[in-house]
Amino acid sequence: MTFLESIFSQLNKSATEPVLQEIHHEKVHSVTGNELLAIIQQARHFLVARGLKKGDRCALLAPNSIRWAALDLALMAEGIVVVPLYARQAPAELVAMMRDSTPSRIFCLDAAVAAEIKKLWPQAPQISLLEGVYAGEPSTPTPPMHHEDGDVISIIYTSGTSGEPKGVVLTAGNVNHIVSATNSRLDKLMGPRTEADRIFHYAPFCFAASWILLLTALSRHSILALSTDLAKLSDELKLAAPEYFLNVPTLLERVRARIQTTVQERGGLATAIFPRAQQAFVRRHNKQSKFGDSLWLALGNSLMFPAIRKSIGPNLKALICGSAPLAIDTQLFFMMLGIPVLQVYGLTETTAICTADDPAHVEPGFVGPAIPGVEMKRADDGEILVRGPNIFSEYWQRPAETAKALQDGWFHTGDQGEPNENGNWRITGRIKNLIILNSGHNIAPEPIEEKLAQHLPEAQQVVLIGNQRGFLAALVTSNGANGANKLTDQQIQSAIETVNASQPHYKQVRAFHIVPEPFTMESGLLTTMGKLKRDAITQRFAAEIEALYQKKSS
């Protein structure tokens, strides 16, 4: 049975039970298995009536919603290749990806976005608004088309080191394996039970990991609640009351910071107990416990931790974290509160996942062992190589880049890492220049650096930083001796604002630091070809970079 057949089967089993939810205006709106099948069928009728057929490609440009999920399933059920796009992406970038993938039709939520696409791409294919897709009369649901393992299911765009997004081609075989493996891990985490597991979800479905969670949740006995307003995430969590929550490091770090600030503001006994309990927990993890640690932990567990857990989510049993490595102290923080944090690791090219924590053997700071059926090894330079049925088939219309990434059956991830004696992997850095923010967004620095340099003729070099951080920042070097006097904060800020105006939110530069002297070969910060030695630069200016982020976050 394919992943799609499993989903349709589970929806039939959950005919009268809620399977998907949206949160709007402090109310939870649910659809049952039967209701979701019905709107999927409406969408399928729309597709067939427009002459769309197996192998065609369609772009799906909308924020998360029940209708997004239904259209995605309808497209796949008809054998149509889905090209999901990020709704908050700059219109010019969206058009570039659609020109590359040549969709037969574009599905869009917003008429204003549709108009912008037509303005930038007058020859664009027909654009259909989601509202019109579901205007038809309901009819009896029919089974999905059967997919062979080699059938293309989706093309998901991911940033490359050149800055030009590449379409990652994923097949039915890729998704079949990952959904099965993810279900296996979730079975260990959630265990057998008669009631549906409640899962909360906010990351855009155009991200591979987010999409895989959607498919996995629909293929099992669960209720997936979708966030619709990030500004109200805390309130939505209380309404959904989930047991499990997929998130990224940035969010967990914000929650941690908010809790610590709240404790500090309370004063009194709380400010005495909490930091000491936290230090005691870290020492216990490191097997360095001191006399009195048990007392501080007991006080924390009896007087503080239960209330904090309830404020995060009264029913929360575990957090699942991916998209970027999670700081070990943040993972330990939530474990101290009694909320396990499981990590997963993967890329779009690995169909989102290649490692996942075993709930019974979580090691903080590690992302778990390879999932069943997937092989991983460490190359001589420390790069992580992956092989298995989850590996993408190709980069869309990029044979040279495909050949470079896939060598002798092994996918070269561009990440550095190492396994421990238990087979759990630790991610240690990036081989490539690609910056991965804590939000999980992948950003090629070169195009943004080039644009900033164009607006800063006084600068010698511009270097973007932000790997495993919450936002981008820049190091800007002055042009020539005593150049610090020629390059002002106002000039840099003006250039940043100009460039930011054409960038999506996650590609915007939020802070900068002026370096008085240019980087040179002699200083060890440029190669003999004049290229930036990024690792050396970030190491040399580690203190300045840390101060930059601390100042911006305070």
Where are these regions (language model features)?
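Conserved AMP-binding A3 loop
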Residues: 30-34, 153-180
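Conserved AMP-binding/adenylation subdomain of ANL enzymes
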Residues: 176-198, 205-302, 315
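Conserved C-terminal "lid"/linker of ANL adenylate-forming enzymes
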Residues: 460-463, 470, 498-554
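Conserved AMP-binding/adenylate-forming core of the ANL superfamily
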Residues: 20-65, 69-73, 90-95, 173
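Conserved pre-ATP/AMP-binding loop-to-beta segment of ANL
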Residues: 16-18, 139-157, 164, 190-198
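Conserved ATP-binding/catalytic segment of the ANL
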Residues: 370-437
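Gly/Ser/Thr-rich phosphate-binding loop
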Residues: 243-246, 258-362, 457-460
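Structural core segment of the AMP-binding/adenylate-forming
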Residues: 49-50, 73, 77-148
